Amino acid sequence: MIFNKLYGGFTMKKAKTAVALGAFIALGLGAKVEAETVPQTGVNRIHFINTKGSPGTDAILLESNGHYALIDMGEDYDFPDGSNPLYPFRGGITTSNFYAIEDRLFRHLDQVGVPKLDFMLGTHVHSDHIGGADEVLQRYKVDKFYLKRYSDDRITSQGGLWDNLFNYNNALNAAKKYGVNVVQDISDKDSHFKLGDMDIQLYNYKNEYGPDGKLKKVYDDNPNSIVAVVTVNGKKIYLGGDLDNVYGAEDRLGPQIGKVDLMKWN
């Protein structure tokens, strides 16, 4: 996604630098964390997991006063080989292990000392955002998983289908297998919650439907990205997945969100 204008009254800053959150630190890409054996209390940090050779891959760890959550889980190693007609092999599907951050994500979570995740949020169904969801659900206890509904039928561009349904179904099947509460129809009440000291407000979280009662047609799943705005220690951080302005989402949300201190988007 390319952000080609100021987002309402937003202040845009590079996400690749360490940013002070009051007395605490939001870790930048590539920042190292010393191993911890127990969760840290009184600490508020946002970890932007190193994305190696894939600038679009997202996995963001929220850490607040001994509580943890993931926004996106990054690219993993698996992809459809075409043997199942439900998941055809299409051009554009990521097949190179070079782009997978599954091992890196787990290593980082273990170094931090994450015992469980209060929630996971999949911004949208592209593999570089939720490819690793099923692996995370297998490895860690997760209380809640936010993920909007998806269907291949809603994507109008063949070039935007990739392995979306494969990732989506893998994530939901894993959540069901491990008894995780999945929230797919996010209500206004569901959209605002706390993680330790962090106040989290979701935007663009509602499933949109057309006159036929089916999910509204879109060219690609990027416009469906859930936005999370985290406020902690007087600072506001925008985590936007791959949201774009093709259907005017940026114009609509900018005035609602207002000025932020840090933006992270792809």
Model region roles, listed by residue range:
Residues 120-123, 148, 266:
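Conserved residues at the C-terminal ends of beta-strands
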Residues 36-115, 184-265:
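Core dinuclear metal-dependent hydrolase active-site scaffold
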Residues 6, 10-35:
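Sec-dependent N-terminal signal peptides of Gram-positive bacterial secreted proteins and lipoproteins
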Residues 140-144, 178-180:
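A short helix->loop->beta-strand "cap" motif at the edges of active sites that frequently abuts
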Residues 143-152, 264:
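Short internal beta-strands
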Residues 137-141, 255-258:
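Short, conserved loop/helix-junction motifs that constitute active-site signature segments
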Residues 115-128:
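Metallo-beta-lactamase
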Residues 122, 130-139, 155-168:
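Metal-dependent catalytic neighborhoods of phosphoester/phosphodiester hydrolases
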